[in-house]
């Protein structure tokens, strides 16, 4: 269950739980509760969701898109209980009627699909790389620096510099 959290006071959400405990589902709900809040459909550009693996990142993006699509086209007489439970949870947290949640989900889905490059669900490594690239000048790094994952290559280069 999502708690109603004042995002101005506490803008960070960290979930720590074991495998198979529903973390991804909970993170998707949390993401949707922020995305569908009154600030607008482009809010996704200012949300950063970080995972450990590429697989988890891809899964979370897929689940967010799938949830938005399911909510936007939701029909209580035809659709599954999972979408109904997501909508119910969002109604509790956001204090909105189903029709408004569906409308916002549709607008947000369109915005994300048209600006997918700003849909920030990534691994810790990718997030850090983006951060370092943003401040490469301040860190006295070349604008086009490269990351090497080959330890031996890096060690050899360091030893040559000594």
Where are these regions (language model features)?
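Gly/Lys-enriched N-terminal cap/neck module of very large, oligomeric protein machines
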Residues: 120, 137, 142-152
């Amino acid at each position: 269950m999502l708690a109603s959290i004042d995002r101005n006071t506490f803008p960070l959400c960290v979930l720590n739980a074991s495998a198979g405990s529903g973390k991804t589902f909970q993170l998707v709900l949390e993401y949707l509760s922020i995305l569908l809040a009154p600030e607008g459909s482009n809010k996704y550009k200012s949300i950063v969701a970080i995972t450990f693996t590429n697989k988890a990142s891809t899964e979370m993006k897929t689940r967010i898109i799938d949830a938005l699509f399911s909510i936007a086209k939701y029909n209580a007489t035809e659709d599954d209980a999972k979408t109904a439970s997501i909508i119910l949870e969002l109604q509790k947290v956001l204090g909105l009627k189903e029709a408004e949640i569906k409308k916002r989900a549709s607008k947000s889905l369109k915005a994300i699909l048209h600006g997918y490059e700003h849909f920030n669900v990534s691994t810790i490594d990718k997030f850090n790389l983006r951060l370092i690239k943003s401040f490469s000048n301040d860190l006295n790094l070349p604008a086009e620096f490269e990351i090497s994952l080959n330890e031996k290559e890096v060690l050899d280069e360091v030893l040559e510099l000594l």
